[in-house]
Amino acid sequence: AFSNSITTWFWFAPQISRAVSDYNFTHTAIINAMWQVPGPRDGIGKAVLGGWELGGIFKRNSGVPTTPLIAGDPMGVQNSGSDTFGIPDLIPGCDPINHNYKNTPGLIYIKTSCYTVPMATPAIASQCVAFSAVPGSCSNLLGNAGRNSIVGPPLTNFDFSMHKNIPVRKISESANVQFRAEFFNVLNHPNFGPPLPFTGATNAIIFNGDGSAAGSPAGGLQQPLVTLPRDIQFALKLIW
């Protein structure tokens, strides 16, 4: 299973588990290029400015999905471990994603205010068991916020390289020593995973088991980053 997976959904309501897969990337773009830099053909200029290559790989893809949940076992299915949870209601017309999350303390990505616990209607009130913290609610009712209904932040990464080829004709006509400078995530762009419902991090838990609002880090992005900070390495390579 993936870290954003929920291992077992409600067997009696299979329709609520119908969604994009846990590893879905709706859009992915990868652009790579290698350029042999033009330089002088002879003399000192060739020795210093000749033989350079510049390369880069740019990647941009959509985020992976995640699922907002209610903690505990409000449905009373009495499964063990991570198989116990409830589904909240999404308020119609409310965008659950905080698009300004980078400027929000705690990197809050999910607008928890866009969700409520399922509420009892007159038609079903007699069959409902209320959350202890929310009178008039219905803990044994599934909400409308479906599986993988929130898409996490996109991933952006750019790797850059510089190569200097130095011919070594004493070895062979094609031999050269290549100096390599490689910069991974050269822009040092932070890429976060989505708020996760389980695997020890409960950022996608919107409400506690009693129906009260979950505190920090509810709605916050996952740590650590899904890509490493800028990494630079140098190498010499003999090619013949």
Q: Where do the model's predicted regions map?
A:
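Short, solvent-exposed micro-motifs at the edges of structured domains
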Residues: 1-240
